[in-house]
UniProtKB/Swiss-Prot annotation:
Gene Ontology, cellular component aspect: extracellular space; synapse
GO molecular function, one term: substance P receptor binding
GO biological process: chemical synaptic transmission; inflammatory response; neuropeptide signaling pathway; positive regulation of cytosolic calcium ion concentration; tachykinin receptor signaling pathway
Similarity comment: family membership: Belongs to the tachykinin family.
Origin organism lineage: Eukaryota, Metazoa, Chordata, Craniata, Vertebrata
Functional description taken from the UniProt entry: Tachykinins are active peptides which excite neurons, evoke behavioral responses, are potent vasodilators and secretagogues, and contract (directly or indirectly) many smooth muscles.
Modified residues (Methionine amide): M68, M107
Chain positions listed as propeptide in the UniProt record: 20-56
Organism per entry: Mesocricetus auratus
Cellular location(s): Secreted
Site (Cleavage): P59, K60, Q63, F64, F65, G66, L67
Signal peptide (residue range): 1-19
Protein name: Protachykinin-1
């Protein structure tokens, strides 16, 4: 048991001494190295720097297709206002919501009332059965 303790102490002392020797040879302050951005750029290898630039690059607005689908890049506010005026007639825009008995979401078309849902489920079942 005493031999294991002696070996462990010897190992810890030798690692401490080797760490002090490495620290004595390195005269640079660790935190001041990171403040100089030119040294950081030179220290990074070219492929690694390229990967970091690709990660940091933001996509163009035309490249982003959200849940609403592709956006028209050349559409302006004037075109949208003209379209709304044409749809609703001479600038009178109706703010009423036209509610229907179905909802189309990400999971597909769903009925809002249970009677219509049960009826459509039965019709689908009958159709598949034939």
């Amino acid at each position: 048991m005493k031999i294991l303790v002696a070996v462990a102490v010897f190992f810890l002392v030798s690692t401490q001494l080797s760490a002090e020797e490495i620290g004595a040879n390195d005269d640079l302050n660790y935190w001041s190295d990171w403040s100089d951005s030119d040294q950081i750029k030179e220290a990074l290898p070219e492929p690694f720097e390229h990967i970091l630039q690709r990660i940091a690059r933001r996509p163009k607005p035309q490249q982003f297709f959200g849940l609403m689908g592709k956006r028209d890049a050349d559409s302006s506010i004037e075109k949208q206002v003209a379209l709304l005026k044409a749809l609703y007639g001479h600038g009178q825009i109706s703010h009423k919501r036209h509610k229907t008995d179905s909802f189309v979401g990400l999971m597909g078309k769903r009925a809002l009332n249970s009677v219509a849902f049960e009826r459509s489920a039965m019709q689908n079942y009958e159709r598949r059965r034939k």
